[in-house]
Design a protein with these regions (language model features):
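N-terminal pre-Walker A segment at the start of P-loop NTPase domains
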Residues: 1-16
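Hydrophobic anchor at the beta1->P-loop junction of P-loop NTPases
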Residues: 24
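Conserved lysine of the Walker
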Residues: 32-33
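Short glycine-rich substrate-engagement loop in P-loop NTPases that contacts/grips substrate
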Residues: 43-72
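Structural recognition of the conserved hydrophobic beta-strand(s) that form the central parallel beta-sheet
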Residues: 74-75, 100-106, 128, 137
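Conserved catalytic/switch belt of AAA+ P-loop NTPases
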Residues: 85-109, 118
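Interdomain motor-coupling "hinge/lid" segment immediately C-terminal to the ATP-binding subdomain
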Residues: 114-228, 232
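Accessory nucleic acid-recognition modules appended to NTPase machines
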Residues: 182-353
């Protein structure tokens, strides 16, 4: 499959110019490694089954040996050996050069064994990455510039129209922004990527993320409850009540533990409230808007199809908002922005700020 340009490409280039190392974080299958490989000069894949044990033995003995190679050197799934973090930081200090390493991984590392001694501040820049936006998947024309909307008061967007029909938007939301889905011919097969993603998260990754055994059935229930309440301000207690209908003994600490694991896997990424008054506590009193990192996760968790959503446009409205949030996170990142929502006590609201 031909590499499709990502907005993250330019962001990675700039960070490599400014820092000794860059850590790309984000959900699995969103294209982190492929994007990193476009700019790396050498690669080491820590999860290579033929070399993994040898790499781990080297990491335990002398981790700096794994860092030898042409730079920028990509260390894929570095969290397999957390000690590499300090090794990278130390090597960056010693070399005193920019653009030495790229680290990629699909989980937030929980350093229970104290293998990471330093934060990496000033040496290792963290760069979030998301599934593909509609512009990156070549489904949006990109005719409206987000940058110009901010920079040019005279910028006129009247008359700009999308050539995507409602049916195409629904399918794009169900398929998601997973690069692997674009390398598949049939639409039916494209939809399997997101479905398999949810299965892998629930059956394997939610326990593997920190070595704590968790129930796949409960993980599915929590993801389904999140999906039912996607892009709403529903309280955790309401979702827990929804879950206990089918699994009575689920407690709030257990619910929080599962959600935390899904957040560390970059599956759940709630949207925080925005408050225009910097010193005001209004934003703190506002709850988080429930959201997945990609709309296809919600669709797959609910077991819905494009046809189901065509017959239920109200539900699709929430799924569509999730897709808009994903795309705006991708676009606004390049401008140094972030995505929030606004909802005040007078019920004045803006879905996305």
């Amino acid at each position: 499959m031909k590499y499709l340009d990502r907005i993250a490409d330019r962001m990675l280039q700039l960070r490599l110019e400014a820092f000794g190392a860059v850590q790309i974080v984000g959900p699995k299958w969103c294209g982190k490694t492929t994007t990193a490989m476009q700019q790396s000069k050498s690669v080491i894949k820590m999860q290579d089954p033929d070399k993994r044990e040898g790499y781990l033995a080297t990491a335990r003995t002398k981790p700096s040996l794994l860092l030898k190679g042409e730079t920028p050197r990509l260390i894929d799934e570095w969290q397999v050996a957390p000690v590499l973090w300090d090794a990278v930081r130390n090597t960056v200090d010693e070399r005193n050069q920019k653009g030495q390493f790229i680290l990629t991984g699909s989980t937030v590392v929980e350093d229970k064994n104290g293998e990471i001694m330093h934060t990496g501040t000033g040496r290792i820049s963290k760069m979030p990455m998301y599934p593909m936006s509609l512009y990156e998947s070549k489904e949006s024309t990109g005719s409206i510039s987000l940058r110009l909307l901010f920079d040019d008061p005279a910028y006129d967007i009247d008359g700009f129209l999308s050539d995507m029909t409602v049916e195409k938007l629904i399918f794009a939301a169900c398929r998601g922004g997973w690069p692997a889905s674009l390398d598949v011919t049939s639409q039916e097969a494209q939809l399997l990527i997101a479905q398999d993603y949810v299965n892998v998260i629930c059956d394997e990754d939610i326990s593997r993320v920190d070595g704590v055994r968790r129930q796949p059935a409960l993980a599915r229930l929590i993801m389904r409850s999140y999906a039912r309440n996607i892009c709403t301000l529903v309280k955790k207690s309401k979702m827990l009540a929804d879950i206990t209908v089918e699994m009575e003994k689920t407690s709030m600490p257990t619910f929080d533990d599962y959600v935390s694991a899904l957040q560390r896997l970059f599956v759940i990424e709630d949207v925080e409230a925005w408050c225009p008054a910097i010193r005001s506590a209004a934003a703190i009193r506002s709850g988080a808007k429930r959201c997945f990192v990609d709309p296809s996760i919600a669709v797959a968790a609910l077991g819905m199809s494009p046809r189901n959503l065509e017959l239920d446009l109200r539900t699709f409205g929430f799924i569509f908002e999730c897709m808009c949030i994903r795309d705006l996170k991708v676009y606004s990142q390049a401008l140094g922005g972030r995505v929030s929502y606004y909802h005040d006590r007078y019920d004045l609201e803006a879905d996305i700020v």
